[in-house]
A protein has these predicted regions:
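Active-site pocket-lining/capping segments in soluble small-molecule metabolic enzymes
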Residues: 1-32, 36, 41-200
Length: 200
């Protein structure tokens, strides 16, 4: 959750529901992050500007309840990220309303993007473009630094990314380097055989 109104509603009406503190809150102050971890959230998604910031990460309580976004495409310290998150929220609400009323008409997200976030150059970055960012967490870092420190939850971004970028990201994070080529081929072949991927 990011909205206090929604959080209060869930806490009052569904007191056993497990709440996640969203990265959309953009908690960038280390003290505020520690305070957030002191509340009764099931998971706190850490702002990825803290990725690889060992001085802050080592001091965090409840590391096992922190979730880290490993492959952020956004520019570190982006001043527009909060506004972009709000825009995405507005678009999601508009989309839900649209499909209730107009099931067979396509949704035009541009109508709900007055700040033109859909053309943000960073949102088009792929797995090969982001590896140089200071916020990027490599598979080796996960196993050799984060897990030994007590972190257990890692999240891969990609809901709105190109399917081919998602595929390559999965290969990077979830397949051993020596198995990636075969895993990639097997997945692509399966997608082709099922009609999910069509080559023209």
């Amino acid at each position: 959750v990011v909205s206090p109104l929604l959080e209060d509603y869930i806490r009052n009406n569904y007191p056993k529901y497990k709440l996640t503190s969203s990265t959309c809150k953009r908690i960038t102050d280390p003290k505020a992050l520690e305070e957030e971890l002191g509340r009764d959230y099931h998971i706190v998604v850490v702002d990825y500007d803290f990725n690889n910031n060992w001085e802050v990460l080592e001091k965090l309580p409840r590391k096992k309840d922190c979730e880290l976004l490993v492959n952020a495409c956004c520019e570190p310290n982006c001043p527009r990220r909060s506004a972009h998150y709000r825009c995405i929220g507005v678009q999601q609400i508009a989309y839900n309303e649209h499909i209730k009323k107009y099931k067979n008409l396509p949704f035009d997200a541009a109508k709900y993007d007055p700040e033109n976030f859909r053309n943000c150059p960073y949102s088009q970055r792929g797995i090969f473009d982001i590896r140089g960012l200071r916020t990027h967490i490599t598979p080796d870092d996960i196993w050799n630094k984060y897990v030994p420190m007590g972190f257990e939850q890692f999240k891969i971004e990609g809901r709105t990314a190109s399917p081919l970028n998602v595929l390559e990201t999965y290969m990077y994070y979830m397949a051993k380097p020596e198995c990636r080529d075969e895993a990639r081929f097997t997945l692509l072949k399966t997608l082709e055989n099922t009609g999910a991927l069509i080559f023209k």
